[in-house]
Amino acid sequence: GKPVVGVVLIPVKNEIYYAVEGGGAFYESLNGENLKISASHKSEYNEMVMVKSRSHASEKLMKLIDKYKFKDVKDSGSSIKICLIARGLADIYFRFGNTNEWDICAAHCVLSEAGGKMTDCLGNTLIYNKVDPLNRNGFIASNNAIHSKFVEMAQETI
């Protein structure tokens, strides 16, 4: 299956991201900010912000960071990275290695509704609600401007 509703709550920041298939993606904060969000359209690496995991940095990822000169590389937690791309505050997130589908499903819906894209690292559509809930080929979340190029970049590291 595919995600059709997504809600990502970030209690420590008093923020929430949510989306329903066909209805757009939204961000709200406790201070009253309420925005319809969309991914950026940046396509030049030196203008893009990469987000990465504090706890899952890999040799593959470090090779990409060294080779491609992104504007900035920021650490962030879990599904928050995907939501930052959906909001246009970041542009690319590579996750090499296994992930559980429940860790990314809601954020995937938010990103898709914001105009971004997520695939596995081979460029295949992510499938949810499988017998085996593990995504064994990692994933790439992007602003979608040059997603196919990011898939090629991921292949360089394999």
Ranges and model annotations:
Residues K63-K67, C83-I158:
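Oxyanion/phosphate-interacting regions
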